[in-house]
Amino acid sequence: MSLRRSILALVSVIITTITTPLHAEIPDALFEKLGLERDSAPNVLYDVIVKRYRDVDQGAGEGKFSDLWEPIPFSAYMAPQYFYEAPEELDFDVTRTECVECHQSITPGWVHSWKDSVHGNLDEIRGLDETDSRFYKKEMISEVETNLQSMGVLGDGEHLNVVGCIDCHMGVGAEGGNHQADLMMPDAAACGQCHVQEFAERESERDTLDWPQDQWPAGRPSHALSYLANVETGIWAGMENREIAEGCTMCHTTQNTCNSCHTRHEFSAAEARKPEACSTCHNGVDHNEFENFMLSKHGVIYNTQGDEWDWELPLEQAFEQGGQRGPTCQTCHMESEGEYSHNLVQKVRWGFKPMPAIAENLEHEWFEDRKSAWVSTCSQCHSPSFAESYLDLMDQGTADGVELVSQARVIMDSLYKDGLLTGQTTNRPSPPEPEKDEAGPFFGFFFSKGNNPTAIDVEFAEIWEQHNMKHFKALAHVNPGGFTYSNGWAKLIRSLARIRDTDTTLREKAALLERIRALEEAQ
């Protein structure tokens, strides 16, 4: 390289450093936990993050119950970094250009998606003017090139011509390779090589969730450690029906890949900004966020007017320039203190399961600070007093639900302790390892043998794992029917009534049997 090119490259780096706040949206906590300075070079930041990302002692791998289960063929696509191996029939060499030429006929859907992506149209993006909503992506391409130059993948001043199949599936800049030996299914670290900023933001979820009273393990619940949460759930590891288990995995892949939100092979940011992008996982009996959002006034605004909004603009411009007049999952959960990032847990307060240990500590500074952050978020559309009053309503309503669960738990634990559950002393087989038997267990949704679980076990499990979650989620997403009597409170009351009835029935039966035994012994 000439001296002139070296000087120009250095000047460019200096100017960028002066005019652009480095890693502005990455929380301080990540740098503190990893022992890095905020102005660390992209290659340094990436290497340190990847080292932790792939460390089995810090959440990577198959989990502490790995000896209890074996992957099935589909597992290779859920956790490709652990299980994917290319088929033997792919043992031949390919070049960069041959990828598209061949797959145009074999898997045209892939190619069509890629041709519509930014990856396939870098020069088009570079030619945009400021009136185009995608103009900001020009800077992103430059940032990616700076990252790759820092890593030595690109030379100083060298530009990307296109991001093709081979760049993601064999290595950035590769011109050819063996279709079997060199082929990989990209994990999040592969995306992070180019998208260091976004990768770091997502990984910072581990660092911004330190629960003050240890209500949850550090860094959880989060997208960054979602696969760990999955494989270290006892019944997931212990159940024989691996195909059903992989259904759980399908919503726990965000730790492994980025395409849960940015679907391949277009990886559209506009698609990922819409609530439907979240809906595949954030729905159902224990986390029905999507349904509650859609039934809220926020969702009504989105449903009736969202097709008029400009989804190509970055989130921070959605309200002022994009015509957006109601929040989405993304504008609420990706925002913190006015900045938007791929860390979605910086304002988490109730976690993924309301519990007494949270309800009893909401006045702690940690929770209060996060509540203030929510008031700030809501105040983009509401007055601060309105926002605070609703958050107070949500907190108290959620705590009320927690109290009903606690009442049910006392009854169920007492029945279990006294051995009075149906068949408990005669027909209650142990659950699969590593699960331990208890009243109303989570494993009761995935295992049934003899009288384990009993009908009332399932009823109690529905209270704490489903009804209470729906109650909280409806409160949090402002769907009134969802926390009053369509779901939530009314179903909590109904199940609690059934548990109380069953408690009375079982205890009266036990007392009657005891009287019969006494009479028989007296004869």
Q: Which stretches of residues belong to each language-model region?
A:
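Bacterial N-terminal signal peptides that target proteins for export
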Residues: M1-L8
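Bacterial N-terminal signal peptides
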Residues: A9-T17
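Sequence context of c-type cytochrome heme-c attachment sites
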Residues: A24-R273, H287-Q324, S341-D369
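Long, charged, low-complexity terminal extensions
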Residues: I26-P73, M78-A79, I106, V345-L362, ...
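Cysteine-rich micro-motifs
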Residues: A189-C191, C278, S379
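Glycine-/alanine-rich, low-charge beta-solenoid repeats
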Residues: C261, C278-C281, C332
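Glycine-rich beta-alpha junction loops
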Residues: V285, E335-S336, S385
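A conserved mid-domain beta-alpha-beta active-site/ligand-binding segment of alpha/beta enzyme cores
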Residues: C329
